[in-house]
């Protein structure tokens, strides 16, 4: 059963399928499309810098508007993030297994957020082409659509390791549990918080994470946004990517518990969207809870001492504490020297 629902291939496993390099990506597209349960079957195959290969599929939710759906490329990006892959090098997308086209506008926005976007190569192949050719993502979308000019000089972009330094708000810590199971609720809450701390939300500063519970397993995902405020992947959708990739074909109606962690006054709240989606697809008795978080405060630091050499070439006395510590933090600097050893005699 696990092999039937395989979304990640090591280099050795891919080679056994005939995929020995990025030029052979089409050989995995059939497997990706076979995993699609939606009427329109779009598959995506990507090669990561680790040498592993990842699959993505489009996911549609019956009875919900298209903006709830997950594009194959978005699924692939979330799959990379869930597996801590730092870079995507090559990508192939097809809705029929023969023609390979550029990603759609929305998905290109997501791809441009990846830290090595300028290095990503896209397979282009028409119905009559034998092998097709790869072209850079940069040639598909001009520089003005990138995120480099929006973020700081040293941006932390999508797929790079993140820690949003979020902590649960005390008043939420004692909130009611899922199905009267306080231990399960606490565990899901912590898993959702972990996900929120990995959330990619550099523009609107509204990180969030979701943890889903199904038959003893927990699946998690986090909010991913783009510079375009109308294009993002919700935390429930990201958690569903984890569920689909690791759930070995389980139906969404088996999900019996869910926890969302987000900032209390987030500019982009996820609760309404998450609730609507889960009410439509999860088990009728699925218990959905929301907990709030905030950035951890550092202003409890009221005193600090630095010890360093007096004439150190690279002194450590800086202004970091002024930014994070209490306004009245007492900061002292003491100097040291190497101890003389020439008094030691045999």
From Swiss-Prot:
Active site: 73 (proton donor)
Reaction equation(s) it catalyzes: cytidine + H2O + H(+) = uridine + NH4(+); 2'-deoxycytidine + H2O + H(+) = 2'-deoxyuridine + NH4(+)
Superkingdom per UniProt: Eukaryota
SUPFAM superfamilies according to UniProt: Cytidine deaminase-like
Cofactor: Zn(2+)
GO cellular component, one term: cytoplasm
Single biological process term from Gene Ontology: cytidine deamination
Pfam families listed in its UniProt record: dCMP_cyt_deam_2 (PF08211)
Residues noted as binding Zn(2+) in the record, renumbered to the chain: 71, 104, 107
Broad class of enzyme this protein falls into: hydrolase
Record's subunit section: Homodimer.
Protein name as annotated: Cytidine deaminase 5
Domain spans labelled CMP/dCMP-type deaminase: 20-148, 183-304
Statement: the UniProt record of this protein carries the keyword Metal-binding: yes
NCBIfam families, sorted: cyt_deam_dimer
E.C. number: 3.5.4.5
Classification via Gene3D superfamilies: Cytidine Deaminase, domain 2
Cofactor note: Binds 1 zinc ion per subunit.
Family under the similarity heading: Belongs to the cytidine and deoxycytidylate deaminase family.
UniProt keyword annotation of Translocase present: no
Binding sites annotated in the UniProt record for substrate: 58-60
GO molecular function terms attached to this record: cytidine deaminase activity; identical protein binding; zinc ion binding
